Amino acid sequence: MNGNHKQALSGVTLAAIGVVYGDIGTSPLYTLRECLSGQFGFGVEPASILGFLSLIFWLLILVVSVKYLSFVMRADNAGEGGILTLMSLATRNTPAKWTPLLIILGLIGGSFFYGEVVITPAMSVMSAIEGLNIAAPSLDPYIVPLSVLVLTLLFAIQKHGTATVGKLFAPIMLTWFITLAVLGLNSIFQHPEVLGALNPVWALRFFAKYQTASFFALGAVVLAITGVEALYADMGHFGKSPIRRAWFMVVLPSLVLNYFGQGALLLAHPEAITNPFFLLAPKWALLPLLLLATLATVIASQAVISGVFSLTRQAVRLGYLSPIRIVHTSEQESGQIYIPVINWMLYISVVIVIMSFEHSSNLAAAYGIAVTGTMVLTSILSCSVARHSWHWNKYLVAALFVALLAIDVPLFAANLAKIFSGGWLPLTLGAVMFTVMTSWKSERFQLIRRLNEHGNSLEPMIASLEKSPPTRVAGTAVYMSRVVNVIPHALLHNLKHNKVLHERIILLTLRVEEVPYVHNVRRVCIEQLSPTFWRVVASYGWRETPNVEEIFHRCNAEGLSCRMMETSFFMAHESLIMKERPWYLYLRGKLFMLLQRNALRAPDQFEIPPNRVIELGSQVDI
């Protein structure tokens, strides 16, 4: 490996530290405090301290290091990861009868992420600012307003992109992880007996001693691995090797040292349970640590916000959400996007959550259900990929499946116990998003099928028009066509009402494939159907934005002359009329009509000049 490559790789590794590990890296702020807060019925005593530390350590090893970094990250779609990507991979080679179930599981996983994303910024930022209690107890009433202020500033700058401030993320997070390690080491040196918790026997003793209470305590232990999905979701931005290297070289050692440092502090001073993280620091370091913690939690929140933007774009491109406005904030990086409606809906939700729960300890009850639910679904989908795409031995996959669920299911079940104390929040948000996605996909499919049922077959219609041509006018007309073998409705309406056709007709179909990018050589496929009709099929990946001007440029390069200002774009606009339905389908139809009315119009989706667009309306029963 040459020097330049090593330097580039280390730079990407540093960048991964700054983005990927923000959420899991700020978990020491609250995890051990919530584990030992007394809610499970046992006090701050050596058996519980060492038991929790052992559970946290082995969760970091088994879930993060083994499951995600060694197994799940093998499943990539042209380098991209994430739950919807995993869903796409799982449905490729699986028997058709299982496909609907796998799609539903993938959509539930995506919906869980929307539930989690509301809680993460609130939980992280509040936990950091609660350090004011230690530095200046009189400032306690200002924790909620300060948390809202910090997050207001964060959401307000989203429209400007994070390319500039993003350069600071990596050094800040590296400083954060070094600080975690130093604080923990200092405490461990004073009480090295805490290292005994590395032995999994302490976890087993914990279960044996506390029995039922220890099961429910898993709901707090899981806070140590919140954000683990980011490792897989951000794989496309940084690559597998930098993410793995960052974990094993920096993040894992720092987290373990800090957790064990907090444990050592609690062994000597049980009263430090009020906030063991900040009490690790000497008094002179409290304010700098508070500032650093706030910056780290803001960065963690930024990573989650960027993640929900990326997930939303993928869902829109794959047809699970209605088209919405997506703004690219960087000319160099396609991943730098801003979605106004998602940004402000998320901001309002986060502020409501902060003002309702008022303290991170109250919010901790809501945290974990979405994370562990996604973990279960990830295990199911990744094992499906291992069996049907990688063709692993079925007995090996079965053993792996059982081993993964033996960890994931108890964690999820323990978190279900928190439904009435806050766990309802992510479940409700997830249920809303699942309803929206399935309603849009199902109703859109039915609408297109209904339109095509009454459509005319392409070839016979073109032959008829060439044989008995209507009046022709100069110029080029482009008709957007959803299906390549059916005449577009806009063309039929134009013939019906205007009785004319342009001298050149292009039937344009835009396809989004289940890959992040489509190679330029496959971008456009041109077929001449008759002397005056052409069919153009343009293919895009879900990370790309369809652009008609680019399509025209490629058509020109392949011999089909297209000029934007000499072309008219004809598009169909459907007015939907609801037929009689059962009440639950009626509600779904009403939701679809609401989404359709507020969806981004096709000219805006495909960057077509508005003065070149002609929309022809029709009524459609649904």
UniProtKB/Swiss-Prot annotation:
GO CC aspect terms: plasma membrane
Stored InterPro entries: K+_transporter, K_trans_C, K_trans_N, Kup
Residue ranges of the TM segments: 9-29, 46-66, 99-119, 137-157, 169-189, 213-233, 247-267, 285-305, 337-357, 363-383, 396-416, 419-439
Topology in the lipid bilayer: Multi-pass membrane protein
Recorded superkingdom: Bacteria
Reaction catalysis annotation: K(+)(in) + H(+)(in) = K(+)(out) + H(+)(out)
GO molecular function annotation: potassium ion transmembrane transporter activity; symporter activity
Keyword Cell inner membrane: yes
Location(s) in or outside the cell: Cell inner membrane
UniProt keyword annotations, A-Z: Cell inner membrane, Cell membrane, Ion transport, Membrane, Potassium, Potassium transport, Symport, Transmembrane, Transmembrane helix, Transport
NCBIfam families: kup (TIGR00794), PRK10745.1 (NF008015)
Protein's job: Transport of potassium into the cell. Likely operates as a K(+):H(+) symporter.
PANTHER family recorded: LOW AFFINITY POTASSIUM TRANSPORT SYSTEM PROTEIN KUP, OSMOTIC STRESS POTASSIUM TRANSPORTER
Family: Belongs to the HAK/KUP transporter (TC 2.A.72) family.
Protein name: Probable potassium transport system protein Kup 2
